[in-house]
Structure formats: structure tokens, C-alpha cells
Amino acid sequence: MRILLANPRGFCAGVERAINIVEKVIAIYGPPIYVRHELVHNSYVVNTLRNQGVVFIEQIHEVPDGAVIIFSAHGVSKAIRKEVQSRNLTIFDATCPLVTKVHMEVARASHKGIETILIGHYGHPEVEGTIGQYNNTDGGIYLVESLEDVWQLKVKNKNNLCFITQTTFSVDKSSAIIDALRQRFPFIKGPHKQDICYATTNRQEAVRNLTMATDIVLVVGSKNSSNSNRLVELAQQTGKPAYLIDCASDIKENWLQGINIIGVTAGASAPNILVLQVILKLQSFGAESAEELRGYEEKMIFDLPRNLHVVNK
């Protein structure tokens, strides 16, 4: 059996930035450090940070006065931000800059009273934070996840609409939903640049290429990782068997019966060490050394928050 690795795969710039922020804050302030929600959706990363003294919370009242709190990469609503700012807390923001871009689009639409349609997944923390940027009661913000949602949607003024997209949404699915929105609301406006982030787009394209060259696809990522789940769905849509695995021990040897070429990729929140462990596990089942497919070289780097630069001097 051969192993082919998707390229690119694994950590994106937003995840690397978020982890870097937390590690620097721990080095400066010492534990415990509080993070609102899981920093990124990967159990290995979360458990590693927890062992370093990070306490993950959902409610702000769980954080004691005088403590340090960090917002996760998914971002938070205006209400959460206001609640934190009203407390005696030291605040650092690990929100992905590409999520912040979407937040700013929503805030501008809210200020102008433009009704906003968010293409995203119900219950995802990024979606909750994005919806929480809109506070104009004369307008409104609406969440759609499917074509059915589009056809059933009711708005106040069909001539004063815009749409935005969750950064980790499926590229193909969002394209179909946007087409439906434009069909139903001809005057709807979209962002100047697409909201789905570069890493999501690149990893989905890499999986398309991977499925063409392999018999099975293993996606390294946690069950609550939106972008990892999209990679599995995309691979399965090609008719190839595809599995989401949190770690190497999740692999079942019977998956590999009759398989000649195994494809491996990783979601944007999955560290490379997990991919290396998967390769070793596959080799224990008789696979050869891994080869990497040609792909797009990502050079994106996001700067740290300004207030962390000041403290770090």
C-alpha cells in the first residue's frame, strides 16, 4: 500500500496565530489562563494547552476577577466582548483575522440597516459570534444552511439585502446557496472578496486532487471541526470511502482491505504530529513510506495582537 499526503493540509495561519498567542500569554503571565470556548476545534491541541494551565470556559462569570482571558479563534459576539470589558480582566483576542473581516462586514451592514443573510452552520461558535455583531432592530440577520432555508426565508425588504459566509463553509455548497440567493433576491449584494478563507478553499481543492489518486481518504481532525467535516464530505461525494479520525488509534485495519493507495489529509486545526502518527500506524499495517502530492504553498502569516506586542517588550 502507498500513502499519499494532500498538500496543503493541517494548521492554517489563523490557528497558528491563536496557539502562539496563548503560549506567549502563558509565558508572560503564568497559569491559569482562561480561554472562552475551545481555542480551536481539535482535542489534541485543547488537551495540550489544558496541560499547560489553560482553563476553557463558556460563561464569563466562570473567570475570576483579575484573571487573563483570551477569545478563541472563532470570535465572540459584541455582547460577550462588552461583558468581558466590564470586568477587571486582562483581555487578549485570538480571533482569526479572516473572521474579524466578516465581523466588520456585518457591523457595517448593521449600522446601515441592511438586512444580512449569513451562510453557515447552526450552532457553530463562529456563526454565533458573527450573528452577534448585528444589533440594528430596523434590519435583521438571518442564518441559512441549505437551499431549503433560502426558499423558506422571509425578509423585511428584498431590495436591501447582503450576504456573508462562515469562513469554514463548503466552497461548493456556498456557491449553490449564493446562486439560489441571487435567484430569489436579484438585488442582493455580496462581499467584495469571498468570506470562505484561503485555507478552507485550499484544503478542499487538495482533497479533490487527493481523491483522484487514491482508493480511500483519511481526514485527521476532531468531530467538532467544521472544516475537517467538510473535507470528509467532499471526499465522500466522489464515491470514495472517507473517514474522520481524531488520532491514529481511530484507524480500523479492515478499512484497508483491498486498498492500494491511502490518501491522508488534515483539517486546519489538526497539528502535523497527528499526521505523522497516522503514517506510522498505516506503516504498521504494511503501508510504504508517504509521498506528498504537488500543491499550493501557503505563505500567509498573521501578526499578533497589538497589546500582546506591548506586553512582550
Swiss-Prot record:
How the cofactor is bound: the record states:
Binds 1 [4Fe-4S] cluster per subunit.
UniProt keyword Cytoplasm, yes or no:
no
Where, in this chain's numbering, is dimethylallyl diphosphate bound? Answer: H41, H74, H124, S225, S226, N227, S269
List the cofactors.
[4Fe-4S] cluster
**Where isopentenyl diphosphate is bound, by residue?**
H41, H74, H124, S225, S226, N227, S269
Gene3D superfamilies linked to this entry: 3.40.50.11270, 4-hydroxy-3-methylbut-2-enyl diphosphate reductase, catalytic domain (3.40.1010.20)
Q: Where is the signal peptide?
A: none
Specify the superkingdom.
Answer: Bacteria
What biological processes does GO assign it?
A: dimethylallyl diphosphate biosynthetic process; isopentenyl diphosphate biosynthetic process, methylerythritol 4-phosphate pathway; terpenoid biosynthetic process
Gene Ontology MF term list: 4 iron, 4 sulfur cluster binding; 4-hydroxy-3-methylbut-2-enyl diphosphate reductase activity; metal ion binding
Q: Where do the annotations place [4Fe-4S] cluster binding?
A: C12, C96, C197
According to UniProt, this protein's pathway is: Isoprenoid biosynthesis; dimethylallyl diphosphate biosynthesis; dimethylallyl diphosphate from (2E)-4-hydroxy-3-methylbutenyl diphosphate: step 1/1; Isoprenoid biosynthesis; isopentenyl diphosphate biosynthesis via DXP pathway; isopentenyl diphosphate from 1-deoxy-D-xylulose 5-phosphate: step 6/6
- Family named by the database record: Belongs to the IspH family.
**What is the protein named?**
4-hydroxy-3-methylbut-2-enyl diphosphate reductase
| Organism, scientific name | Baumannia cicadellinicola subsp. Homalodisca coagulata
